[in-house]
Design a protein with these regions (language model features):
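Oxyanion-binding/catalytic loops of NTP- or PPi-dependent enzymes
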Residues: 1-73, 77-83, 92, 99-252
Length: 253
């Protein structure tokens, strides 16, 4: 029996299994280890990941992302005139990760472990567990994301304290974690469920529009997504470059 570990992220997700004493990352159909946490409806069928993220630009009316931010709430997303809650959309992402794992491993996946932010409340955790019910699989457990990070870093039996700084695409989480032997204890947590890399993308997009005489808030969804994508790529390039240029051909039409 193979248990799949799932890092269900706000903007990206990935899966891993433990084989022969070490973790093995699962590639998706594109050979990539990271799958965008995006969902879209194409010809009446659910598509997840890279294609869905692209369709946020071309078909925003039937695509969604960042839904993890609304786990444990009554917020729904209208995709192709049908309403989906955050847990249902998240289940589509997990289903895709399971299918990728089964294709890669040639094994059946019946159980998953899903990581969640340490600050998730009871309703948010229950919503995450509901993913298993929607897919007909067992959620063996939920593991706090800082605990998972500490386990990866804690290599011996000595007492250690870590500060886990998790600045993701959609959230910021900071935790103080104590480790001793096989015991992981989270002593303090703080964070912001609505601050992440996508918010930097949004700020850059608004500034780009301001500098070019545009009002970001009145642009249609496709325009906004095009600008967001260009600014996201610029942000990534700024990790290795001091200056980058953002240009959009679509603004000429």
């Amino acid at each position: 029996m193979t248990i799949l570990g799932v890092d269900l992220g706000t903007t990206n997700s990935l899966a891993v299994v433990y084989k022969e004493g070490k973790p093995v990352l699962i590639p998706n159909a594109y050979g990539e280890y990271v799958t965008p946490s995006a969902v879209s409806i194409l010809d009446g069928k659910i598509v997840v990941g890279k294609l869905a993220k692209e369709r946020l630009i071309t078909h925003p009316e039937c695509s969604a992302s960042l839904f993890k931010r609304n786990m444990g709430t009554d917020v729904t997303y209208a995709l192709d005139k049908k309403e989906y809650d955050a847990a249902t959309l998240s289940s589509f992402v997990v289903k895709q990760l399971i299918e990728d794992a089964q294709n890669y491993l040639h094994e059946s996946i019946d159980e998953v472990v899903i990581s969640v932010p340490a600050y998730f409340n009871a309703r948010q955790r229950q919503d995450t567990k509901r993913i298993g019910e929607l897919l007909g699989i067992k959620v063996e457990r939920l593991i706090n994301e800082p605990s998972a990070a500490a386990i990866a870093c804690h290599m011996d039996d000595e007492y250690e304290t870590f500060v886990v700084f998790d600045f993701g695409g959609g959230t910021l989480d900071v935790s103080v974690v104590d480790c001793f032997e096989n015991v992981i204890s989270i002593n303090a947590i703080s964070g912001n469920n609505h601050l992440g890399g996508t918010d930097f993308d949004r700020a850059m997009s608004e500034y780009f529009c301001f500098k070019n005489g545009l009002n970001y808030n009145v642009l249609d969804s496709s325009f906004q997504q095009s600008i967001l994508r260009a600014c996201e790529q610029a942000k990534i390039r700024l990790s290795t470059q001091s200056v980058v240029e953002v240009s959009l051909v679509c603004l000429l039409y």
